[in-house]
Amino acid sequence: MPKRMSRAEWERFLAGRRVAVLATLAPDGQPVLTPIWYVYRDGALYMRTGLESIKARNVRRDPRVTVCVQDERPPYRSVTVYGRATVEPEQEGLDAAIARRYLGTVGGAFYLRTAREAVEQSGEVTLVVRPERVLTQDFSPETPLVGRLWLLAKRLLPPGL
């Protein structure tokens, strides 16, 4: 059985560099899932999207969302946030914070320069998700030390060994 994370643990987990999967609702009620970069700060998830993107349109119509963030390698962990999203104007510095988070200082600066024209043409908004309920899973206690050492070795060794 996975253990539950404390609030401090899941907030630290969300602050790590992982890609989220945002679920919004289509007009017919069908879930629409989208991998998306985010920043977690001040108790909320902040994401950027186009003004008229499917995500933004879905949230304007029905603000209920789910966001799942996971570790894709053992020991598996995940945080699923249930809440309501708001569509807010562009926030100063948020693009830079997200780009740096995922691409580093140099890569983030390059990304911002190359994406600026597309961003300006589409118009950008911020999706803000404030957690109403959080579900966590942490399988770390179930991964024995030998298994953890093997996983570490696999990451360090060339593929195929």
Outline where the language-model segments fall.
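Charged, gly/pro-rich active-site loop segments
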Residues: M1-M5, R77-L161
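Short, basic/aromatic recognition patches
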Residues: M1-V21
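Alpha-helix boundary recognition
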Residues: L14-A15, R60-R61, E120
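Short beta-strand segments
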Residues: R18-L51, R57-V59, V65-V69, S78-V81
